[in-house]
Amino acid sequence: MAELVPFAVPIESDKTLLVWELSSGPTAEALHHSLFTAFSQFGLLYSVRVFPNAAVAHPGFYAVIKFYSARAARRAQKACDRKQLFQKSPVKVRLGTRHKAVQHQALALNSSRCQELANYYFGFNGWSKRIIKLQELSDLEERENEDSMVPLPKQSLKFFCALEVMLPSYDCRSPGVGLVEKPVDKVEEGPLSFLMKRKTAQKLAIQKALSDAFQKLLIVVLESGKIAVEYRPSEDIIDVRCEEELHGLIQVHCSPWKQCGQEEEEYLSDFSLEEEEFRLPELD
C-alpha cells in the first residue's frame, strides 16, 4: 500500500516513537546525538526530544522521536525495541499512543524543513524554484513626503513574492505566494538597521512563498520504494504565468494578517506532542 507524506509537521501517533530505559550516564545532549544517529538510518527524522525521567522513577531519560513517514517509524520500532543500540542495557521502543482525545490542526512546514524533505525524497537536483515576482508593496517614500507636522501612522515594510517549485522528473510545477509585513521606523532605527530589516522581509517573503508552493504537493511512497508526486491545488490558487496576472493576486493577499514566525512554528509543532498526551506502555 502506498504511503502519503505531506509537507506538514508530523503529529500522528504512528509517526512517533517513545524510547525509554535510556541510561543516566550520558548527558541529554549526548543521548540526542546517539538517538539521532541510530534512528535516522530508518528514515528522515523531524525531531528528537530527550526528557529526564520523573522524580518518582529511577534516574535516566526517555525520548520522543518524530518521523515524517509512518512506515519508517514502524521499521525503526521493530528493529530497535529491546536492543542495546548505543548503551550496555537494551532500550524499549513503542509507537506513540495517545491516552486522551486530542485534536490538532496540521501545521505547514517552514521553508527549511520543506527543502530538507524535498532533498530526501527527490534528491538535491530533483527540484528547483523559479521566482516569478518579487515586489515591495511598502509606501514609506510617500509618507516621508507628507507634512512633517502631521503624526505619521505606523510604517511597515511589505514584500510580496510569487514563485513556483518545479519537479522535472515528475513533470510537475506548484505555484506559491508569500506576503510579509514588518513594522519599521527609519528615523529611530537608522539606515543600516532599516536595510537589514528590508533584506530580512524580502527573504521571508520568498521563504513563505516556497513553503506555500510545497503545501500543494504530496509525496507518494510506493511499496517498491519508488516515489511519485501528487499535486493538490487549492480552490483559490491562481496559476500565475506572467506579471499581468499577478495584479489581482496581489490585491487579494495584501490584507493585514497576523503572521507566525518560523521560531513560533517550531515551538507550536513540538507542543502538539507534549509528554502529557502520551503514556509509556506497561511491559511485562
Swiss-Prot record:
Gene3D superfamilies: 3.30.70.330. It holds the Pfam family Rad52_Rad22. Residues 15-98 form the RRM domain. InterPro entries: Nucleotide-bd_a/b_plait_sf (IPR012677), Rad52_fam (IPR041247), RBD_domain_sf (IPR035979), RDM1 (IPR040224), RDM1_RRM (IPR034200), RRM_dom (IPR000504). Residues 90-133 are annotated as: Necessary for nuclear and nucleolar localization. GO terms for molecular function: DNA binding; RNA binding. It comes from the Eukaryota. It is found in: Nucleus; Cytoplasm; Nucleus, Nucleolus; Nucleus, Cajal body. Keywords: Cytoplasm, DNA-binding, Nucleus, RNA-binding. PROSITE patterns: RRM. Residues 1-92 are annotated as: Necessary for nuclear localization and for nucleolar accumulation in response to heat shock. GO terms for biological process: DNA repair. GO terms for cellular component: Cajal body; cytosol; nucleolus; PML body. Homodimer. C-terminal half contains cytoplasmic retention domains as well as determinants involved in its stress-induced nucleolar accumulation. PANTHER family: RAD52 MOTIF-CONTAINING PROTEIN 1. May confer resistance to the antitumor agent cisplatin. Binds to DNA and RNA. This is RAD52 motif-containing protein 1.
